[in-house]
Structure formats: C-alpha cells, structure tokens
From Swiss-Prot:
Native organism: Staphylococcus saprophyticus subsp. saprophyticus (strain ATCC 15305 / DSM 20229 / NCIMB 8711 / NCTC 7292 / S-41)
Gene that encodes it: rpsD
Annotated region (Disordered), positions in chain: 20-41
Pfam families cross-referenced by the UniProt entry: Ribosomal_S4, S4
Domain S4 RNA-binding: 92-155
GO biological process: ribosomal small subunit biogenesis; translation
Gene3D superfamilies xrefs: Ribosomal Protein S4 Delta 41, Chain A, domain 1, RNA-binding S4 domain
One Gene Ontology MF term: rRNA binding
UniProt protein name: Small ribosomal subunit protein uS4
Job of this protein: One of the primary rRNA binding proteins, it binds directly to 16S rRNA where it nucleates assembly of the body of the 30S subunit. With S5 and S12 plays an important role in translational accuracy.
Keywords: Ribonucleoprotein, Ribosomal protein, RNA-binding, rRNA-binding
Subunit note: Part of the 30S ribosomal subunit. Contacts protein S5. The interaction surface between S4 and S5 is involved in control of translational fidelity.
Signal peptide positions (record): none
Annotated HAMAP family: Ribosomal_uS4_B (MF_01306_B)
C-alpha cells in the first residue's frame, strides 16, 4: 500500500489528530471534513475504532502499510508488552528522532531532511528515514548542511526535547540516550486497539 500523499489537514480532521505536529489543523475545525461538518460523527464499530487508531499512528509517522506492519511484527518478537514495544520502535526511527530533536518542524520535513542526506549517525551519513537507532548512538547534521535555513529555523523555534534524547543546539548534535518510557510517547494513541486490529 502506498504512502498517503493527500491533504494532511483533511486527514488530521478525519482522524482527530494533528499529523503535522503543529495542531493548526484542528484549531478552527476540530471535526471531520465534509458538508455535514461537526454533526457527522457517529458511533463506530469495534473494528472501525481499531482501524482508525491504526491509521492515526501510521499516518502520524508517514509509513506505508508494509513498513508499519513489519515494524509491528518485529515488536511482537521482543520481550515485553507488544503495543509498547511497537511505540518505542517507531520513536527510535531516525526521522522520528530528527523531528523530536527539533531539527525539523514536522515529521514529513524530518523524512525529507534524512532522505536528502543531511543527517549523520555516529559520523556516517544515513539517508534512510526508517533506520532504527540504538541507545548511545549520536545524530548530527552533516557539516555541509549546517547552514540550511530549514534546519536553523526549526531549531530556533523548538523549546522542548524529550528526556530520552540529548541535544546540543549550538553544534546541531544529539544523542539517543535510551528507549523512551510509554509516558514520553504520543498520549493520544491507544496502541492496544492496533494490537487487536492485527490480531483479528
């Protein structure tokens, strides 16, 4: 299944979550798009709730269904709680960490920054957004990309870096210190519904 490339604003309103990370999509119209507007919400079936939760998380990270499902299966082979493992694996993706460090304003922008070869991991260029970081690995902006406006502007407006990451804003370097706790990951996601969806 291809990655969704349509309007993130409409998709955000339909799913009830900000896919850009800015929250602007839901400020004026916190309801699904369409002529019926706020009145078109209806009670969803159990399956529909599970599907919507899966789509929320998949679109949030900008992944294809195959990528998403593969990561879910990897999480299932780890020790611990399946859903929590899954959320932690997603948070350890290189594009997710670039976004969380504040090197990009949105997750989509973070993917582009990685794809275009602006990021190094432990001193080596990595242009794969799905690259999974391990605790202790260092992330930095390549020397030739240090003066990119898109990165400088993002860092300037960012005022929060999660505790599982370390960031040196002056040198545009960060570190993935540890696996995040569930409480440090998106609270608006109910990953158990996703586990139930794939267990059907």
């Amino acid at each position: 299944m291809a990655r969704f490339r349509g309007s993130n604003w409409k998709k955000s309103r339909r799913l009830g979550i900000s896919l850009s990370g800015t929250g602007k999509e839901l400020e004026k119209r916190p309801y699904a798009p369409g002529q019926h507007g706020p009145n078109q919400r209806k009670k969803l079936s159990e399956y529909a709730l599970q599907l919507r939760e899966k789509q929320k998380l998949r679109y949030l990270y900008g992944m294809t269904e195959r990528q998403f499902r593969n990561t879910f299966e990897i999480a299932g082979n780890q020790h611990g709680v399946h859903g929590e493992n899954f959320m932690q694996l997603l948070a350890a993706r290189l594009d997710a960490v670039v976004y969380s460090l504040g090197l990009a304003r949105t997750r989509r922008q973070a993917r582009q920054i990685v794809n275009h070869g602006h990021i190094e991991v432990d001193g080596k260029r990595v242009d794969i957004p799905s690259y999974t970081l391990k605790p202790g690995q260092e992330i930095s902006v390549r020397e030739k990309s240090l003066k990119l406006d898109i990165i400088a502007e993002s860092v300037e407006i960012n005022n929060f870096v999660p505790d599982y990451l370390e960031f040196d804003a002056d040198n545009l370097k960060g570190k993935y210190i540890r696996v995040p706790e569930r409480s440090e990951l998106p609270a608006e996601i109910n990953e158990q519904l996703i586990v139930e969806y794939y267990s059907r």
